[in-house]
C-alpha cells in the first residue's frame, strides 16, 4: 500500500475516531417526556437574607395564596400579566415563537405563576435593616394596587403602590421596550419621623427543573451570570449541590461584584436575567431551597438610607425572552434595541448565548452566517455560502496538501522500486523512503491537513446550529423546514411518496431508515474517495468501501443544516482536489476507480500508467 493511501486511511480513521468521541462525550439529548411535573406548591421564593443591621426574622410562608387582580402585558412580542400579589412578573409568553413548526401550535410560554406546575417568575422587593422588620417592607406576599389603569405596553408603563401604614409608601414603575427588556424603578417615600434603612433586591425563581430540560453535555441549561468580567455557568444539578450557607438559610453561592454584572436562568433558546444598575457594587446569589425544590438567582443592591421627608429610587432591568443575537448584542453595546437616552450598556451580555469551548470560532462563524442569511434571505443558502467562504479561507493550506498528494503520486514508481530493492528489510525501506521524500521535498503527512482543518470548524458549526435561536425552525427548500433538526424524510416511506408515515424520530427504525440528506452525504463521501484507487490490501479496501456508509448512518441524525454543510464541503473538496491534481500532471481516473469498485477483481495496470491516472501500480510477480 502506498503512503498516500496510508495517509488517507489515517485521516479517515481519525475523523471516525473524532465522531465516536463526539458521540461518547455528546450523546443525543434525552427525549423530552411529559412525565410528572414538579408538584405545584404554594411556597414562593425565599426572601434574601437580612442586611448586617437587620433582624433575622424569616419571611412568613404563604400557605394559601388568594386570587389577586392582574395587570395585562401586551407588546408586539410579548403577552401575559403581572400579579398584584407581590407585583410578580409571572405570566409571560413569546408571540413570535411557536412550540412546533405548526403555525397553529401554542406560542412559547416563558413564565408561569405559583400554583401551576414548574412555576417560574420574577419578583422584586426590599430587605429591611435597622429598626425595620419584614412586615414593614413589600415582599413576595404583598398585595399591590395599580395607580391608574391600563395594560403594560411599549411606551405605556404601569405603576404599582403599597403603603405600609407606618409612614412608608412604596412605588414600583414597570416599563417594557419593543423586545424583551423590562425596566423596574422602585421608589420609597419616607413620611415617618425617622430615617430608615433598606436594600432593594430582585429574584428569579424556578420551582423544580424545567419540564423540557435536555440534559445535553454540549448545552448549558441552568444559572448563567457575570460579575466583574467573569462569566459563571452552573447547571441545575450543580446548584442543588451547593454548600449550605447559614446566613442564607439555604444552599447558596454568594458573589460580590464591584462594577458590573447580571444573573439569571438560561434555557436552550430562552432566558430570564436580572440586570442591576451597572457601574455600582451589588451581590449576586445562586440559591437552592431543597425542601421546596426551588432554584433562585438573586441580585442585591447597596443599602439605602432614606431621611424623613425624603424619597429614594433604585432602577434595575429584567430580560425575559428569546436569546436573539442581534437583540442581545444591542443590549450589550447600546443598552437598548433603539437609540434611547440614558440606556446603560450591559457588559458581556452576548456571552449569555452558550458559545461553548470553541467560542473563538463559534462567535465569528455565527456572525458571518447571520450576515449571509440577512443578505440572502435563506438560512440553508447562507450555510452553503459560508461553506464556500470557509473553503476559500483554508485554500492555501489545502492547495499545499493537494499538491503534495499529486507529487506523492509521481513518486509511486520510485517507491515501488524501493520496495523491490528493500524486500523484507523494513528499516532500509523506511530510511530510503525518508531520503527520497527529503530529496523530492515531499511531505507524506500533508494529505491529512484538509480533514484535520475541518474538524474544529465542524464542531463549531454544530454548536452554532444547535444553540442559536436563529437556526430554530429555519427552513431551506422542499421538505427541510427546520435546519436545526434532523432530516425528517425517510427511505422507509420512500421519502414521503408512500402513504404510510415515517418512523418516529429517536426510534431504532428511524436510525436505520435515514432521510435523503444523509444519503447524499454518503454518496458525496464515496465520490470523493474515487479520486484515488482502492488500496491493494483487501482489509484496507473493505474499510474504504464501508467508511462513507458508516458515516452516513452516524451523521444521519445530526441537524440537517450541519449535514448540508458537510455535503457541500465534500463537493468543494472533490472539485479542488481534482483541479489541483490535474494541474500538476496527475489525472485521477474517477470513472475507472468507480468501475473498479464494482468489480470483484479490479484489473491491474502498468506502474507507469498508475502514476498518471490514479490506478494502483501492478506488482511484479517473482519468477
Swiss-Prot record:
Pfam families: 60KD_IMP (PF02096), YidC_periplas (PF14849)
Recorded name of the encoding gene: yidC
The protein's role, per its UniProt record: Required for the insertion and/or proper folding and/or complex formation of integral membrane proteins into the membrane. Involved in integration of membrane proteins that insert both dependently and independently of the Sec translocase complex, as well as at least some lipoproteins. Aids folding of multispanning membrane proteins.
Gene3D superfamilies, alphabetized: 2.70.98.90
Composition bias type Low complexity, residue spans: 44-62, 601-617
GO cellular component labels: plasma membrane
Key words, A-Z: Cell inner membrane, Cell membrane, Chaperone, Membrane, Protein transport, Transmembrane, Transmembrane helix, Transport
Assembly mode: Interacts with the Sec translocase complex via SecD. Specifically interacts with transmembrane segments of nascent integral membrane proteins during membrane integration.
Sample GO molecular function, one term: membrane insertase activity
Entry similarity comment: Belongs to the OXA1/ALB3/YidC family. Type 1 subfamily.
CDD domains reported in the protein's UniProt record: 5TM_YidC_Alb3, EcYidC-like_peri
Region of interest (Disordered), ranges: 33-64, 601-623
Protein name: Membrane protein insertase YidC
Gene Ontology BP, a term: protein transport
Lineage: Bacteria, Pseudomonadati, Pseudomonadota, Alphaproteobacteria, Rhodobacterales
Residue ranges crossing the lipid bilayer per the database entry: 8-28, 379-399, 449-469, 507-527, 543-563
Subcellular location per the Swiss-Prot or TrEMBL entry: Cell inner membrane
InterPro entries: Membr_insert_YidC (IPR019998), Membr_insert_YidC_N (IPR028053), YidC/ALB3/OXA1/COX18 (IPR001708), YidC/Oxa/ALB_C (IPR028055), YidC_ALB_C (IPR047196), YidC_periplasmic_sf (IPR038221)
Membrane topology note: Multi-pass membrane protein
Amino acid at each position: 500500500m502506498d503512503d498516500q493511501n496510508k495517509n488517507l486511511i489515517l485521516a479517515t480513521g481519525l475523523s471516525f475516531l473524532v465522531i465516536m468521541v463526539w458521540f461518547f462525550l455528546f450523546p443525543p439529548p434525552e427525549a423530552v417526556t411529559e412525565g410528572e411535573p414538579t408538584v405545584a406548591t404554594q411556597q414562593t421564593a425565599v426572601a434574601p437574607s437580612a442586611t448586617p443591621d437587620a433582624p433575622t426574622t424569616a419571611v412568613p410562608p404563604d400557605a394559601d395564596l388568594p386570587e389577586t387582580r392582574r395587570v395585562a402585558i401586551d407588546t408586539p412580542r410579548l403577552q401575559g400579566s403581572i400579579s398584584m400579589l407581590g407585583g410578580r412578573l409571572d405570566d409571560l409568553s413569546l408571540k413570535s415563537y411557536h412550540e412546533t413548526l405548526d403555525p397553529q401550535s401554542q406560542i412559547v410560554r416563558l413564565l408561569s405563576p405559583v400554583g401551576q406546575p414548574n412555576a417560574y417568575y420574577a419578583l422584586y422587593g426590599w430587605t429591611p435593616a435597622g429598626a425595620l422588620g419584614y412586615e414593614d417592607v413589600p415582599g413576595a406576599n404583598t398585595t399591590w394596587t395599580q395607580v391608574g389603569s391600563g395594560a403594560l405596553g411599549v411606551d405605556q408603563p404601569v405603576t404599582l403602590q403599597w403603603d405600609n401604614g407606618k409612614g412608608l409608601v412604596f412605588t414600583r414603575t414597570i416599563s417594557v421596550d419593543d423586545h424583551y427588556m423590562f425596566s423596574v424603578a422602585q421608589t420609597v417615600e419616607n413620611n415617618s419621623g425617622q430615617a430608615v434603612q433598606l436594600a432593594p433586591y430582585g429574584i428569579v425563581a424556578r420551582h423544580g427543573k424545567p419540564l423540557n430540560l435536555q440534559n445535553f453535555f454540549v448545552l448549558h441549561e441552568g444559572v448563567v451570570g457575570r460579575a466583574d468580567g467573569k462569566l459563571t455557568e452552573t447547571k441545575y444539578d450543580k446548584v442543588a449541590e451547593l454548600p449550605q450557607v447559614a446566613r442564607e438559610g439555604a444552599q447558596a453561592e454568594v458573589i460580590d461584584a464591584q462594577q458590573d454584572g447580571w444573573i439569571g436562568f438560561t434555557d436552550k433558546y430562552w432566558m430570564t436575567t436580572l440586570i442591576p444598575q451597572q457601574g455600582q457594587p451589588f451581590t449576586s446569589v445562586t440559591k437552592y431551597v431543597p425542601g421546596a425544590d426551588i432554584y433562585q438567582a438573586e441580585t442585591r443592591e447597596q443599602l439605602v438610607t432614606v431621611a424623613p421627608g425624603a424619597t429614594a429610587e433604585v432602577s434595575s432591568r429584567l430580560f425575559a425572552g428569546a436569546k436573539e443575537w442581534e437583540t442581545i448584542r444591542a443590549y450589550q453595546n447600546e443598552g437598548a434595541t433603539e437609540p434611547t437616552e440614558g440606556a446603560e450598556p450591559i457588559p458581556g451580555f452576548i456571552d449569555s448565548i452558550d458559545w461553548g469551548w470553541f467560542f473563538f470560532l463559534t462567535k465569528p462563524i455565527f456572525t458571518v452566517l447571520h450576515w449571509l442569511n440577512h443578505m440572502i434571505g435563506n438560512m440553508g443558502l447562507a450555510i452553503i455560502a459560508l461553506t464556500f467562504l470557509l473553503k476559500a479561507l483554508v485554500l492555501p493550506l489545502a492547495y499545499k496538501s493537494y499538491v503534495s498528494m499529486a507529487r506523492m503520486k509521481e513518486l509511486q514508481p520510485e517507491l515501488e522500486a524501493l520496495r523491490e530493492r528493500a524486500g523484507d528489510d523494513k528499516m532500509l525501506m523506511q530510511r530510503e523512503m525518508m531520503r527520497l521524500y527529503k530529496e523530492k521535498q515531499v511531505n507524506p503527512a500533508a494529505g491529512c491537513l484538509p480533514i484535520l482543518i475541518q474538524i474544529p470548524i465542524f464542531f463549531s458549526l454544530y454548536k452554532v446550529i444547535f444553540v442559536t435561536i436563529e437556526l430554530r425552525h429555519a427552513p431551506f427548500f422542499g421538505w427541510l423546514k427546520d435546519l436545526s433538526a434532523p432530516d425528517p424524510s425517510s427511505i422507509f416511506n420512500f421519502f414521503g411518496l408512500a402513504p404510510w408515515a415515517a418512523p418516529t424520530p429517536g426510534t431504532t427504525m428511524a436510525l436505520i431508515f435515514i432521510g435523503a440528506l444523509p444519503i447524499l452525504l454518503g454518496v458525496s463521501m464515496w465520490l470523493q474517495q474515487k479520486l484515488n484507487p482502492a488500496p491493494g490490501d483487501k482489509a484496507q479496501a473493505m474499510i474504504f468501501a464501508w467508511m462513507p456508509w458508516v458515516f452516513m448512518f452516524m451523521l444521519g441524525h445530526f441537524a440537517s443544516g450541519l449535514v448540508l454543510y458537510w455535503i457541500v464541503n465534500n463537493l468543494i473538496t472533490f472539485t479542488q482536489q481534482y483541479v489541483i491534481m490535474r494541474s500538476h500532471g496527475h489525472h485521477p481516473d474517477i470513472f475507472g476507480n468507480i468501475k473498479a469498485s464494482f468489480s470483484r477483481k479490479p484489473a491491474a495496470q502498468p506502474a507507469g500508467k498508475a502514476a498518471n491516472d490514479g490506478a494502483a501500480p501492478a506488482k511484479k510477480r517473482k519468477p
